[in-house]
Structures are given as C-alpha cells and as structure tokens.
C-alpha cells in the first residue's frame, strides 16, 4: 500500500511545530526566562536550541524521510538485520507512556476552558480558586470525562487520514492558536502596569543571572532547549516519513524550532504583563495556570472573555501535541499488525483511555501510590519519558546517524541535504559525532540527579 503524504510544506511545519508546542511552553519557559535573567536566558536558550535541538531534530526527520516508515520499522528499513530495531519498540512505548499522563493534563485544559466560559470562577477570591482546583483533582469521574473527550476526538481526527484528518485539523488549529496568542499578548501588554512585567521578562538582567549562578542558568537553558522539541521517541521522525525531498532538512528543523520558540516567548508576553499589572506572584507549573491566572482574569475587564480565550489557547496547544503523538502510535501499531487505520484507531482509543486512568486516579483514589522515588503517578510517568526515554533515545538517534555501526554519517548527510535550503555542512561532523552525544549524556545525568534529589 502506497504511503500517504502531507499535502503541503506548511502542513509539515505546523504539524511538527504542533508536536513540539505544548503546555510546557506556557507554564515553564516564561517562568524560567523571568527567573534566570530575562533576555540573557533567551539568548543562551536560542544558542542551545541551534547547537543541540536542531541537529537531533534533523536526524529524526532524515531517518523518517529515508525509511518512509514509522519509528517502529525505520531501523529495519535503514539497517536491515541489525539490533537497532529494538529502539523502534521503545519509541512506541515512549509515545504511549507520554499519552498516559498528557491526555489527563489536556483534559484539565479543556475543563478549565469550559468552566471559565461558564463563569465558574467569577467572583471567587484566591482561596476559592484554589479550592476549585482541588475539587477538580478530587473528582475522578469528571476528569475521566474530559480526558475521554480528548482521547475520542483525537483518534477520530486521526482515523480520517493524514491529509483529510491530521493535516487539515492541525493547520486550522495551529493558525487559530497563533492568532489567539497574538490577540492575548496585545491585550496583556496594554494593561496598566504591564510594562514592568515586560521589563522583568525581556530585559537582560545579569545581576539576577549572577545571583542564581551562571552554571545553573546554562544548565536550565540547555535542558529547556532539549526537552521542548520532544526528541528521542520518534515523535518527529513520523512527519519526516510523510514529506517529499524538495527541501533540505536542517532548514526545516530550524523553522520548526523557531515556531516553537515564538509560542514560548509569546506566552510570556501574555503572562508577565498581566501578573505584574495586578501584583500577582509569578510561579511555575500547574499553580500558574490553574490558580494564579484565573485570579488575574477576575480582576481584568471582560476577564471571563479573556480567560476563556486563554484556556482555549492552552487547549489547542495541548491538543496539537496529542494529535501528533496519536498519529505516531497509530502508524506504528498499524505497521506492526497490518490493521486498517480505522480499526487501529478504535483499538488504540480504548487502550489509551484505559492506560490514562491511573494518572487521574493518582490525585484521589490512588493518591498514596508513589511508584518511583516517592513521586506520584503523573510525575513517575513523566520521569520515564522526560528523564529516560527522551535523552537516551536522542543518544541512540545520534549514534545511529553518525557511526559506521548504524546508518552512518554519509547516508545521513546525503538524505538530510537532499533538496533546497540550509544543509548539514561537512565541518559539523566532528561536533555531531563526538561533542553532541556528550552533551545529551550530561543532560541525562543532570535529569536523574535532579529527579531523585527531589
């Protein structure tokens, strides 16, 4: 059966960016930028994005395009008879584990969009808003409902095919996301007192950077640049398999990285002016999204409207990742079993829903279950993906593309450079072969130490 391809280059770029853009762009990147020295952190982050994220992303795209297979089968296609193929199964497992907790978080975004639009938070003080968040976590049935909507809608889109389902929906959703983002950012920057938030966010503050420690800032930027693109589990390789050979792949990797960075930066333009305008502390993680910002919207004129738009923006950001990863899972399972796309979607839909239940139950009925080092179920699942599968998977991609024991540098470079645009240069070989694996391994070790310390 002939492999279905994406209908346009724009579709490929938006799909790949949609996979990279997620809720971490909104609740982590702006906070890190503000705390780690503003514009100084952004410059260091962009440097690491270019020297770390772009090369590995180029490798994933090249492997997918050359093999014209899912991550499950691409190793067998590129290096027949080798043992590299086992990593394809790890990639599939990584995508599944990622969705075991990400669908729950996407469900939270959807629920907060519905609740904000319905006026649930209107008139509540800080304590009341915090109580609402606690009530959501304590209600497994309601969380399962919203998580189920995310799963069913996601697989329904994927069942329509690459062009008619995935590409069509993602293109419109990503364009809506970008429009919403700019509208929200413009409104936030016009708030009285918002300029102080912009100064805190964007102006380089080397004194603040020195207080935190230059080493800590560099490590933070390096980690964020690596993890923002979701490299290492083949989530990007699948899109390489859906495109032609008109464009060189390093240029495409740069464009996807810049799109991802634009959304991350603009999230800060939404959050910091609003928080500073109303004297609200800016913190990281779920507290920022589910407690701090609903409180801010209660003080803004037409806050219910702007809050609804913000949580719609977040829902789109989460759902774009869900669609991309669902496509990867469906393609892998379909190639492994020979099932039709619709049958695969139906079975995967039921499977992902059931596998996602432990995560949401970990906040109520199973709240005493602490699988890894005393961490709850969501954090434990996140650890398996973010701290193990992403860095180790990226290391495997690098070794496969640069050593004679794998696909090899010459074949990788020939595939990556086919077409017009920015190409992999010969002088990059020593860096990508010897330096890049060391950087990724350092990130892996830092992640392990940090997780078990906390």
Predicted features and spans:
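Membrane-interface "cap" regions at the ends of multi-pass membrane proteins
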Residues: 1-27, 56-61, 65-78, 82-89, ...
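Helix-loop-helix connectors at the membrane interface of multi-pass transporters/channels
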Residues: 3, 73, 106-138, 242-246, ...
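Inter-helical loop and helix-membrane interface segments of multi-pass membrane transporters/permeases
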Residues: 3-4, 32-36, 71-90, 103-163, ...
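Select transmembrane alpha-helical segments in multipass membrane proteins
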Residues: 5-16, 41-44, 83-96, 145-150, ...
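Transmembrane helix-boundary motif of multi-pass solute transporters/channels
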Residues: 11-48, 234-240, 251-254, 258-259, ...
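Membrane-water interface regions at transmembrane-helix termini and the short interhelical loops
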Residues: 32-36, 83-99, 134-136, 149-173, ...
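C-terminal membrane-solvent junction of multi-pass transporters and transport-like membrane proteins
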Residues: 87-90, 338-349, 380-440
